[in-house]
């Protein structure tokens, strides 16, 4: 029998019989690897263990410890769930069921709604099917054969998918009596699906189109073992406890109202104070770094949006209004007014770089189905800046922004990850401009000394970019800072400066945000801190609590003194038990409760008590002011 040569990840070569599969290769390396293998990579493509090898292929064996393992496990768990649903609810029609970042889902068309009790039944049946150790097999059928197969099963959604693929052949995966249209790959048998949990039910339109039929989506998750699953479920419970929508109500920070409109935030006094603190912090930090604060109008003429390209490419996400028979666009971003500021004067190379910063409120039409508390809204404020500089200044400006981001993330206690997205196939601008911008971004990233990923071809059509994702207390990733080079707007708006040689040249433009949308960042902060904001960020830093009504006059004087000193303080002078008032303040996550009783009134002091129950020594009100100033001095 002839043999073929296979390249392994360590660079070694291995001879194996022609016609062998990836499973055969794993077995030839060792019994332990054969047992651990769940899939393979053939020339960089994730495939089943049953895939036949080719000569001179590069092969990697995927085990449960591999980064790609969860994708395969979760995809197979989605099929297992669909199989269980079909057995328990034969009338259900299956549609699509992919693996996603945190688990998997499957969409079903069924008249009767699924209930929480149904999820328990489905999960129990999944466990039985997994224990049955059914072999998962892949077949390649002609499209006509596949249409015949799924038509016979009454699965009209699968028939629609096959017809839309317009391919000569398709792959079908089977386990027991269940078959599904799928590219794979999958585990070799159902017994390899060992730890899973069904989580929730939601609605979803077929193919994401609101004009199509509403389906029922079941979400679940799966892991390699029960320990990992339990850890994830614990994090999930913790994320529910930290949910900013719940905490926003409980802490009286913000609300939404159908009478006002979907995705439009109403900030209550404490939420507005939190936002004000954050915005004041942003202004100070930008001024320290040489930015000029600017403000643009909320609406701009439609012709300006046409000139910028937004009308052509972004119109569906914009809101428009008519004023004196003139059409205006409500701004979805802040850049156009900044362009007009630049154009208001003839610029010299000596003026550059110019850094325009605006806490600009924008409006974007997001579909109702994707709105989510503060994290996805229709009206929001960005810490938006545009840097206009000479090409030779670009490298230094990018490094400055990355240092800015690093400083700010450290203040809030966030770790973060960075990604560089390079030129896509469809792009504008000449090669030299792209090379200059990409090299500047790459150089700045390397200069940080931190690791980063490169997403080849994932940049915007008008320039490369750096995306920065922060990691919160639950190790979740959130997009925040972005640094984006733009070759389009300087060209469209004919931005120029007079260079040292007297020639007019085009400046380089950088869009950048540090926190991103203020609303979204506050939502992330609420969940990161679980509402326990650090002292400098807390909308209420201290709560004065009296023991009896006799202490109210003294407490009123202390309240006024603290407010005059700039402390954000409130008073609870109700005729309630002290323990009740302290508990109320703790539930509101106020950092300090200042107890005032006979002893404090006689000695003209207050007794601070931290929200975790720890008491400080009694002190004069002015000493408490000094204490707060010292604790927050780095953020004022």
Swiss-Prot record:
It is found in: Cytoplasm. Gene3D superfamilies: 3.10.20.30, 3.30.54.20, Anticodon-binding domain, Bira Bifunctional Protein, Domain 2, Threonyl-trna Synthetase, Chain A, domain 2. It comes from the Bacteria. Residues 243-534 are annotated as: Catalytic. One of its GO terms (cellular component) is cytosol. This is Threonine--tRNA ligase. It is an enzyme of class 6 (ligase). InterPro entries: aa-tRNA-synt_IIb, aa-tRNA-synth_II, aa-tRNA-synth_II/BPL/LPL, Anticodon-bd, Anticodon-bd_dom_sf, Beta-grasp_dom_sf, TGS, TGS-like. Residues 1-63 form the TGS domain. Catalyzes the attachment of threonine to tRNA(Thr) in a two-step reaction: L-threonine is first activated by ATP to form Thr-AMP and then transferred to the acceptor end of tRNA(Thr). Also edits incorrectly charged L-seryl-tRNA(Thr). Disulfide bonds: none annotated. CDD domains: TGS_ThrRS, ThrRS_anticodon, ThrRS_core. Signal peptide: none annotated. GO terms for biological process: threonyl-tRNA aminoacylation. Its cofactor is Zn(2+). Keywords: Aminoacyl-tRNA synthetase, ATP-binding, Cytoplasm, Ligase, Metal-binding, Nucleotide-binding, Protein biosynthesis, RNA-binding, tRNA-binding, Zinc. PANTHER family: THREONINE--TRNA LIGASE, CHLOROPLASTIC_MITOCHONDRIAL 2, THREONINE-TRNA LIGASE. Zn(2+) binds at residues 335, 386, 511. Belongs to the class-II aminoacyl-tRNA synthetase family.
